[in-house]
């Protein structure tokens, strides 16, 4: 059963909530800077050459490490979402209210945009790569791929961080979350790019001015995240009472 709570504006503007938004902004900025920065660095080192297997592995590792750190540094303040799909998935399970979740989205997207602007500045105008489906694939395939890989990510978040029965698993949550993102980039990178994160795709799209495929990276991840929240929250957590987002330690 969906456990969505709307919440109140007052609670969403409390001191602790404002700190959570700032935490999401900073952590997402650092994650996107390192993740997108690894792709920019690859382009620099290869003179804008095509992505090869070694480059894919390097970019996947960079994203995995950066997300591990980002989740770790934000966990005790905001829950360490760094991703609108994660926020939506947790909202489906009643772990965060819709109003507060909406401001999380804003903070995450702003963090991504600022990270990309900083990358353009510090690289002397190098372009930031955007997500897009590969040649020969259609938008539908891209959306389905993003649904699957984002489902895996948010399911992992639930299992290791949000489930009240997690026990000692909570201590390895950031590692598990980083690992699943790295693995999914290796699997989906050559096809959809393996975004799993609307904010991660939104920043480069806005800064580059290429919004032609951005809808794929909102629809796919949000559907995947919502499905994971619905299935894990309803089937496996069941009658457990929902906890507040900042009580979820990853």
UniProtKB/Swiss-Prot annotation:
InterPro entries: Aquaporin-like (IPR023271), Aquaporin_transptr (IPR034294), MIP (IPR000425), MIP_CS (IPR022357). A motif (NPA 2) lies at residues 197-199. The modification N-acetylmethionine is found at residue 1. Residues 1-24, 76-101, 156-168, 239-250 are cytoplasmic. GO terms for molecular function: channel activity; methylammonium transmembrane transporter activity. Pfam families: MIP. CDD domains: MIP. The modification N6,N6-dimethyllysine is found at residue 3. The chain crosses the membrane at residues 25-45, 55-75, 102-122, 135-155, 169-189, 218-238. A motif (NPA 1) lies at residues 83-85. Induction: By ammonium nitrate in roots. Expressed in roots with a circadian rhythm showing an increase after onset of light, a peak approximately at midday and a decline to lowest levels before offset of light. Residues 46-54, 123-134, 190-217 are vacuolar. It is a multi-pass membrane protein. Gene3D superfamilies: Glycerol uptake facilitator protein (1.20.1080.10). Widely expressed. Keywords: Acetylation, Membrane, Methylation, Repeat, Transmembrane, Transmembrane helix, Transport, Vacuole. Disulfide bonds: none annotated. It is found in: Vacuole membrane. GO terms for cellular component: central vacuole; plant-type vacuole membrane. Aquaporins contain two tandem repeats each containing three membrane-spanning domains and a pore-forming loop with the signature motif Asn-Pro-Ala (NPA). Interacts with cucumber mosaic virus (CMV) Protein 1a. NCBIfam families: MIP. Transports methylammonium or ammonium in yeast cells, preferentially at high medium pH. May participate in vacuolar compartmentation and detoxification of ammonium. This is Aquaporin TIP2-3. It comes from Arabidopsis thaliana.
